[in-house]
């Protein structure tokens, strides 16, 4: 009985038991109607968010096209070298479509992207999509490792900090988390490399490890994963602490205590489940930020990945690869934020009630 009342209170449902003049069938019909209306609201919200995400990607495509065409330097001269003749350059421009008006180039760019064609490498002639697909898994694995350990530790620290509010432990955790937020990831990367790889020599410094050797690859993930995820430990811990303190003041928590449930069970089974829901949204944004933050880790630790690919191609003025890699990264950021937003709306009854 206590558990069902707590769940009803937590979901903020209207209890139909004991209502004068109401029958069981009327109550059931009302519940079904409420659920159907909630599903329609969820679908409408999803379509709205999906349309907004598509619009963001479209704007990002336009900005990316303009920026890459404003960057100084001639990609044709870079691709063909200093000994290329004028006729060779003109032929190359015609083959790549660079000699066309800008608006036609933009139309072709959008059309090709919609067909899954991100262009060709100006040096090798390889498909940009194939190049990005070879580098992207390295970055995805790095981001997953970073987000995994930072979310786990951040939730634990935030929970302990909220339960021990205003204690010495709470203050120590507060100092640690604020310090983790304040230190830039590239500084953490440099010091981690200096301490653990150069001075102590307990972890490998550069590369992604031997192909096929899982243990060696995991060792090469430790330092960049630590550097990339340290700041997010602080963000997640502070968010979980604030959310836990808010949830601990809710009516269903008071009801659970009134029914005599153990405090540890209340925290682990009821409070924490709702308190970590906002973390889902933060992780969605965090994945996108980590995709861009991976650039520093991949450069410092000489790891293959999408960030290092963009960095190298910018130096080489290889604009098609830069366009394709940045566009894929932007799409991943938008999609991760969309998924996190929808999961958050599904898990939290308070969000669904406000749709």
Where in the sequence are the language-model features?
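Transmembrane alpha-helical segments of polytopic membrane transport and secretion proteins
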Residues: 2-5, 9-53, 165-168, 342-355
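An internal, D/E-rich "acidic patch" concept
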Residues: 38-39, 99-155
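Alpha-helical transmembrane segments of integral membrane proteins
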Residues: 41-45, 132, 136-169, 185, ...
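Hydrophobic alpha-helical segments of integral membrane proteins
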Residues: 50, 88, 92, 96-118, ...
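Hydrophobic alpha-helical transmembrane segments of membrane transport/permease proteins
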Residues: 57-107, 200-220
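Hydrophobic alpha-helical membrane-insertion segments
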Residues: 58-62, 179-191, 283-288
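Alpha-helical membrane-inserting segments
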Residues: 59, 63, 67, 153, ...
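Membrane-water interface segments at transmembrane-helix boundaries in multipass membrane proteins
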Residues: 125, 174-238
């Amino acid at each position: 009985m206590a558990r069902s009342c707590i769940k009803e209170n937590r979901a903020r449902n209207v209890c139909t038991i004991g209502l004068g003049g109401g029958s069981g069938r009327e109550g059931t019909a009302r519940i079904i109607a409420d659920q159907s209306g909630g599903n329609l609201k969820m679908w409408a919200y999803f379509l709205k968010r999906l349309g907004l995400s598509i619009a963001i990607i479209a704007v990002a495509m336009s900005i990316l096209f303009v920026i890459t065409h404003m960057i100084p330097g001639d990609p044709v001269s870079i691709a063909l070298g200093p000994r290329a003749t004028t006729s060779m350059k003109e032929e190359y421009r015609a083959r790549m479509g660079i000699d066309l008006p800008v608006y036609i180039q933009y139309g072709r760019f959008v059309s090709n992207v919609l067909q899954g064609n991100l262009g060709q490498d100006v040096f090798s002639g390889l498909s940009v999509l194939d190049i990005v697909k070879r580098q992207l898994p390295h970055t995805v694995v790095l981001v997953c490792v970073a987000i995994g350990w930072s979310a786990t530790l951040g939730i634990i620290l935030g929970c302990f900090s909220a339960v021990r509010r205003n204690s010495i432990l709470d203050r120590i955790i507060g100092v640690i988390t604020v310090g983790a937020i304040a230190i830039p990831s590239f500084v953490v990367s440099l010091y981690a490399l200096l301490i653990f790889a150069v001075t102590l020599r307990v972890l490998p410094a550069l590369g992604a490890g031997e192909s096929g050797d899982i243990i060696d690859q995991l060792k090469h993930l430790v330092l960049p994963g630590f550097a990339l995820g340290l700041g997010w430990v602080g963000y997640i811990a502070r968010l979980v602490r604030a959310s836990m303190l808010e949830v601990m003041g809710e009516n269903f928590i008071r009801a659970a205590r009134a029914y005599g449930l153990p405090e540890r069970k209340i925290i682990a089974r009821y409070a924490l489940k709702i308190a970590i829901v906002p973390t889902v949204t933060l992780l969605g944004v965090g994945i996108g930020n980590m995709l861009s933050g991976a650039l520093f880790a991949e450069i410092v630790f000489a790891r293959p990945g999408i960030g290092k690919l963009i960095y190298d191609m910018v130096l080489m003025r290889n604009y098609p690869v830069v366009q394709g890699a940045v566009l894929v990264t932007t799409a991943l950021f938008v999609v991760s934020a969309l998924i996190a937003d929808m999961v958050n709306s599904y898990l939290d009854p308070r969000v669904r009630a406000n749709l």
